[in-house]
Amino acid sequence: MLIDVNSSEAILLNLVNGNADVVGDPTRKAIQDGEYGRIPRRELDQLIDRKYLFSNSDAATSYVQSVEKSLIAQMEELPPSFVYIPSYSCNLNCYYCFEKAYDHDTSLPDQGSCSSAKAFLMALKTIVCSFEEAHRTELDPKDISVTITGGEPFIPENYSAILTLLKGCRNLGITPSFVTNGYFLEPFLPILKEFGVSDIQITLDGSKPIHDSIRITKAGDGTFDQIVRSIEALDEFAERLSVRINATKKNLPSIADPSFSKLINEYPNVFFYLYFMQQEGCADRKNVLNELEGLKTALRIQECCSDLKNLDISYHGENIVRPIFGHGAFRPKIAMCAAMSNQYIFDYTGRIYKCWWGMGNPDYQVGDFSMSGHSINRKLESPYRLRKVTSIPKCSRCRFRLICGGGCTGRLSRQDFSLGRTICPDFESILPFMVRHLYQSGENHARA
């Protein structure tokens, strides 16, 4: 991909291996015209060495296929990862909650919730042991991810189940992470400290007036002040505390409020980031921003408000853009996420799922578990495991496939998912815009 960054330079971006190089105007024009003989020999050799150019189309195809084959093998070696839902009950009533897209049981957990937590831990151990036997390896417990979410995990009725999970995970050498709204954290703080929980995500949707119109209690009360108190408490011991701002048409302008940037700067060790919502509750999209326009708006606000420099902006394609400017390494994706590999989601009702978007929906169930054991229906699981860019016709023809990994399946129906349909980000617009923006704003450290 050739991206003009000014009148005399372009960045040549390899969409397979992530290599990026600044080229001058003569080379840019030669590449655009397909007349590679006009490129100086030394520079041409560099382009060949870095896999931009090949002697023929068969050599190019062979290289891409070898990369994809390696990625498939690597994906099969990924350690199992787990999500547990102690209940679907929540103390908030956010209009955009994706769990509102379908009906499921939001009643408070009963006395059986601890038994379900214990059954989950048993299943986790069995799955890990089976993986180790199949791959003839011994996993480091630190490489096994367990995320506890909901609903809302930190409601009073979940306390016993959370304690059971923390004890069980510690016995296995695992420290779980949590996704929470942060509203009712205080009673849980002592056990979170005791068990060394350091990875927690909270959501805060803009300045206080806007947040308090979006993330409200069931009674309609605002939650901003209470969540900020939770951030303050967690900042004392949670080393990987992140605060997500779900950006929509409703709240994006509010990040320009000076009080919001002041809040961000009060907690320099906390990772605050913008995430552009893809859909709202019941699959509505009336407040969903076009991602490119959202990026432009967010960056304009950030440029005008210097105090917002610590606010990160998440976007599709950042996995290849950020490494160009020295932030991390590009990791091509043969599939979208861990749901296409060894991720399993367990809920307190005894059901097992693969994808976050399907949890709580029986139509997306792939197995069940209890104190007697667990069972995974391989036929129901297979569409996930088989979904790779090499097996989706549209993806196999797309040059962005190893950036995207086939796209998120969460918004697809089960039938569309099985048919290999896709929902594609606008990489054709987003990548040039972000590369150009970062280069022109001074992060011109593209690898040469």
Name these PLM-found stretches.
Residues L2-V22, R41-V83, T137-L139:
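N-terminal [4Fe-4S]-dependent radical SAM core
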Residues S8, A339-N342:
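Short loop/turn microsegments at loop-to-beta-strand junctions
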Residues P109-C114, S213-D221, R414-Q415:
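Short glycine-enriched, charge-decorated loop/helix-capping segments at active-site entrances
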Residues S213-A339, Y348, P362-Y364:
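Radical SAM enzyme [4Fe-4S]-AdoMet core and its adjacent flexible, acidic
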